[in-house]
Amino acid sequence: MSKADQTSTYDLLFSLLRSALLGETCPVEIDNFAALLHEAQRQAVDGLLYALPQLSVCEEERPLLKQWIGGLLPLEMANRQMNQVVVELARAFDAAHLRYVLLKGQSCAAVYPRPLLRRAGDIDIYLAPQHFEEAKCVLQNLGFVFDHQTLLHEVFERKGVTVELHRALQPMQWPPAVKHLKQMMHKEVDTVGEWQHFVEIDGYNVPILPPHLNVVLLTAHIMVHATHLGIGLRQLVDWGMVLTTYGHRLDRALLKNALSQLHLTRFYRILSAFSVEYLGFSAHHFDLSLLEKTNSTSAIAASATDSSPSSSASSLVPSSDSSAYSSSSSNLKYPYDSFDALRAKSLLKWSIKVGNHAMFGSSFSRNGGFLAHSCIYFYNMLLHFWWVPTEFLGIPWYMLRRALYRLSFMKHT
């Protein structure tokens, strides 16, 4: 696919996603449905397009459209089955009086206009340290079989459904960030008395993270994947949907402090810029105080006064790169500067290149061992170091820690 065709395809994909999620008007006629569907599937967002009232394609592509439409019922059925498993686990953990929270995936799907259209992955559940071993027994009693473990989680499977029991929220690389995140979870999850935060799935209240910690998790999750093997649009849409849904309930002081301690404030700004510019979310859902940069007053003032409907992401990047992918951009009273816009655009380009996370270089990484991981590390550091410098500086330490963990695990098996 040529660069021009790719640009056109992603302009159309973003327009259709904004229509499916936010009700914006979308194009009536789709010139190249095959290319659009291919990219939507690479990004794991094709299911969201089922929400569109109508798609009009040329005569030659109608068989492909009908074939794709035939996938709607299987997708909804798969998500219903996934929800049933989530509720089954929640009931079992509640009966055992365990402290746990549902992470990412199905908890994000619950805030979509049509939750059954989001393509599901694994079921991720965080367990407080004092309940981790008991939770493993609960899973095994339900017929789940242990598959493997990492520094982050232990993985169980049953009839094609994968459950990851997390002993940590997210594998941060920078040692101080690891420490701060562990302290946050201990204070705000592990030792809390009566739990107050739930999402309703199939009529059952399933515990989830407090809103500010949920935002921290999703920000860190995207950052980790984006700075390693890559990130797809599904996770980026999740982030925007969660901020749009829970933005008014965020404890902004706690969020600001957590992002600062984990060195994620800049990446939060990048995701905010991405969400507004490309996904069409309204800026008022985000904590604008986190986006203000004291060393960029003039840039902030300039962008904050530009509310022209014709403004787009391309206006915030150098003129030599004016072919930027178009934005929705009808709500640009938004204090980010050209550096944030450039990084948001680089995140978009990276997502387009790699597709849904781990597609880029995944086989090379699995088969190449330390050399492969080192090559990917230096490649990403060269391109994306300024997204989150501390994480890149911490990766060698984390790789060594993971290698020692694997050696220790092998000695005991």
Each PLM stretch: what is its role?
Residues 1-121, 127-306, 315, 321-413:
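Conserved NTP-donor binding/palm subdomain of two-metal-ion nucleotidyltransferases/polymerases, i.e.
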